[in-house]
Amino acid sequence: MDLLKTPSSTVGLSETFARLKSQGKVALIPYITAGDPDLSTTAKALKVLDSCGSDIIELGVPYSDPLADGPAIQAAARRSLLKGTNFNSIISMLKEVIPQLSCPIALFTYYNPILRRGVENYMTVIKNAGVHGLLVPDVPLEETETLRNEARKHQIELVLLTTPTTPKERMNAIVEASEGFIYLVSSVGVTGTRESVNEKVQSLLQQIKEATSKPVAVGFGISKPEHVKQVAEWGADGVIVGSAMVKILGESESPEQGLKELEFFTKSLKSALVS
């Protein structure tokens, strides 16, 4: 493991990318759903992902109407909610686990739960839990001002998403406003595993890189070591793997088996980035 990463010196998303860039490395960013199969397994999974060399971990907060998510993550959210997982229980778990991690956590959540709690209160709660980043996929750029202001006030990096169908002017505005990194959605539609990565990603990466020096991470449909390697070769600063991770944890015969498979899979992705 990287000697620069110790639990007591966990830094934010921007600093993580800056460190990796100075080392000529690409960030591995796994995504898992909190509470699937249960929160105790989520806590163990976060530690496994961290120990296998993940650079940032996205943790999905289960929601009953997840518009951006494909079947695997929707099913994970349903299973988690049926178990009684809620925001407070996720925060309690994170308060215990985050001090033991060497990589930062970014929460992936929908806007409604933030609004219900109140934006300022939400930011205070996640900051106190040790969270460094936030992704809210269902908020259009025009409505992010309050979120961005409160996030900045609480030193939470609000990551914005851009897609292959985003017009260039709008993409530039998203790139300008995004903090931590820019999330480039590799394909149109919802999350999920795919056979290959959309080749348009390469030119989109070039376009974004021309507009900014901020790091760009690619996600949606990336599920194999060869996908990870391909996207890194195209010039991405980070690679996000979600549905494949979620399926391993949520659909294994037992939580223990899921954690073993998760470790093996994460190591295979990490190897693809360093080879």
From Swiss-Prot:
The active site is at E58, D69. GO terms for cellular component: cytoplasm. Keywords: Amino-acid biosynthesis, Aromatic amino acid biosynthesis, Auxin biosynthesis, Cytoplasm, Lyase, Tryptophan biosynthesis. The keyword Amino-acid biosynthesis applies. It is an enzyme of class 4 (lyase). Belongs to the TrpA family. The alpha subunit is responsible for the aldol cleavage of indoleglycerol phosphate to indole and glyceraldehyde 3-phosphate. Contributes to the tryptophan-independent indole biosynthesis, and possibly to auxin production. This is Tryptophan synthase alpha chain. It comes from Arabidopsis thaliana. The lineage of its organism: Eukaryota, Viridiplantae, Streptophyta, Embryophyta, Tracheophyta.
